[in-house]
Amino acid sequence: MLIPRGCTLERPVDLDGAVALLAADEDARPVGGGVSLTLLLRNGFAAPGLLVDLGRLRGDLRGIRRDGDGTLHIGALTTLREVETSPLVAEHSPVLAAACTWLASTRIRNTATLGGHLGHADPHQDLPPVLLALGAQVEVAGPAGLRTLPLDDLLVGYYETSLEQGELITAVRVPAAATPVRGKYVKTTARTVEDWPAVGVAVRAAVVEGRVAEADVAVGSVTVRAHLRPAVRDLLVGQVPTDELVSEAARTAAEGLEYASDSFGSASYKQTVVRVTARRALQEVLAP
């Protein structure tokens, strides 16, 4: 990545050093793989005075493990390619691994990090809706120490997160499912499958003894951030998954969002695609 003129580059060797540098300069930006930041710099959307390169950091910021309670722990500096190819991810959350295969190119996935992907907060991203449907949490380090918050609370708006000055994402935690679940992510693109999604819908659901035991739907790329649709869970859980109920759930998933028209499609087009896609995805994961 080219360093902008007038910008300083620092390479801390530990997390505390990185946090201190970020906290001391409001114009500082962390750099993991640098993929998202490069796009912002190239298009003039960012002009940081200080870049904090996280490349020397080790420990829990890298790698994938499964904790004793079954939670999947993914370090923020883990590349998207590592998430895609991890046997642990494939076993724990196969929908997450599958979604990564449709994200940009292998070359990009070899460089881009999970923490950078989420911290970038571009509404046209694949993984936020998937991780929302999976109930993911993010671990954050900052001047006040460590904290954990739901991914839903991290995402605020267009290229905006709830991170305070000096904070950075250190890991993503995906809880284990209480019952065997199925997941599905469907993206609609204007060109190829590797393109930015015009609409992305993620579904996670389970049926136990003929009734819906788990049901989470999240939608991305249609507003300024990805959204979990809790009304769908309220509608489905405890019910027998009939075609009529699934259609109603899909309509519920598509309602109540402030759709934004852009180069990927009109607001009305996106709402229709969400409804149709959600119905198909729910039918698949709720099928016997």
Question: What feature does the model see in each segment?
Answer:
Residues 1-288:
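C-terminal structural segment of proteins
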